[in-house]
Curated annotation (Swiss-Prot):
<feature type="region of interest" description="Disordered">
    <location>
        <begin position="1"/>
        <end position="108"/>
    </location>
</feature>
<keyword id="KW-0150">Chloroplast</keyword>
<dbReference type="GO" id="GO:0004672">
    <property type="term" value="F:protein kinase activity"/>
</dbReference>
<dbReference type="GO" id="GO:0004674">
    <property type="term" value="F:protein serine/threonine kinase activity"/>
</dbReference>
<feature type="compositionally biased region" description="Low complexity">
    <location>
        <begin position="87"/>
        <end position="108"/>
    </location>
</feature>
<feature type="transit peptide" description="Chloroplast">
    <location>
        <begin position="1"/>
        <end position="86"/>
    </location>
</feature>
<dbReference type="GO" id="GO:0004721">
    <property type="term" value="F:phosphoprotein phosphatase activity"/>
</dbReference>
<feature type="compositionally biased region" description="Low complexity">
    <location>
        <begin position="69"/>
        <end position="80"/>
    </location>
</feature>
<comment type="function">
    <text>Bifunctional serine/threonine kinase and phosphorylase involved in the dark/light-mediated regulation of PPDK by catalyzing its phosphorylation/dephosphorylation. Dark/light-induced changes in stromal concentrations of the competing ADP and Pi substrates govern the direction of the reaction. In the dark, phosphorylates the catalytic intermediate of PPDK (PPDK-HisP), inactivating it. Light exposure induces the phosphorolysis reaction that reactivates PPDK.</text>
</comment>
<dbReference type="InterPro" id="IPR026565">
    <property type="entry name" value="PPDK_reg"/>
</dbReference>
<keyword id="KW-0808">Transferase</keyword>
<keyword id="KW-0418">Kinase</keyword>
<dbReference type="GO" id="GO:0009507">
    <property type="term" value="C:chloroplast"/>
</dbReference>
<keyword id="KW-0547">Nucleotide-binding</keyword>
<dbReference type="Pfam" id="PF03618">
    <property type="entry name" value="Kinase-PPPase"/>
</dbReference>
<dbReference type="InterPro" id="IPR017409">
    <property type="entry name" value="Pyrv_Pi_dikinase_reg_chlpt"/>
</dbReference>
<comment type="subunit">
    <text>Interacts with PPDK1.</text>
</comment>
Amino acid sequence: MALLSAMKLQGRPPPISSNLNPNSKPAGSDSVSLNASEPGSERKPRKFSSQLNRWNRARTLRSGAKLDSTITNGSNNTTGPMRPIESSSRTDVSTLDSDVSSSSNGVSEADMTAAKSIYIVSDGTGWTAEHAVNAALGQFDYCLVDRGCPVNTHLFSGIEDGEKLMEIIKQAAREGAMVIYTLADPSMAEATMRACKLWKIPSLDILGPITESISSHLGTNPSGLSRGITNSSLNEDYFKRIEAIEFTIKHDDGALPENLEKADIVLVGVSRTGKTPLSTYLAQKGYKVSNVPIVNGVDLPKTLFEIDPRKVFGLMINPLVLQGIREARAKSLGLGSSFKTKYSELGSVKEELELAKKIFAENPTWPVIEVTESAIEETAAVVLRLYDERQSNRAMPRISKSY
């Protein structure tokens, strides 16, 4: 008890076992073990690096590779996706109730509160649910990192068998996890909802309400087939994405300027404004993208000013941020001091950005997007919104013309 009190005062939950086997011993046995070594030998909480910002730390915690792990299984940390337990072949919800209730007694209250888990279950790739969960967790970074309430997410994809589904839900009940699911098969979704309600598991169906609303709006029933699984047929969209990716790779960093007319989107900006990763992201959505660098002393290709201006987008960034990015880039490449001065010196950076502003001012039909504090996904969303508006000759209402 004294040891537990000391650990609570330090703000650290006691270590717990990750053994979730239905036959695990009750609390108080070997399934929950406390370190009874001398206080001086206790592991001190790891201090976070000043180089690691809150967002990255939170994502590290959510991925399961915790910065200060408290969940142990023997001597090994539990990392990576968890797998369903192999204990029962029964799939009926009502007959599994007693099994879960009896085995959950082997997990103590401390086990349930030390770390929170979210199970993501999908009959496809799980991409939709996983990204929705990560987006929502982004609202809790202040708690996940600084207030010591880490959350682990575990993805179970390709779950099309009722037996496997029930095993996952049983495991979630034992661990006290939340279940978030996208199951296209109505019977699977219904079974999940009933099981979670029976065992008092917090759960959320991401796909169901949206599908029902669209079904009502269209006046037709959904197919109930999952999308994005590995054995899905290769359709036109798949080959369109492959073609777009191949095109984008070949036309990176100003290559083959004679083909700019063939691109759906053309990105223009100075070095290290994120043109290449943004191009790749857009290509994965099926858009052929070329990007053209703005460099002092190098003329832009004439074809850039001859193509449809509705497909051209400029990228702008804060000079201090750009300088930091370039310094890190030069250091990683082991470049000489003379190149570093020309490439990452603040005066040179500002000079290039002034040149970019001048070019953008001379071409007012090109939207200029500020990328300093934007993630690739956020910038891509702005590009695609503007692209759609310009291609369809319609403008969506917006609060500001600042992108």
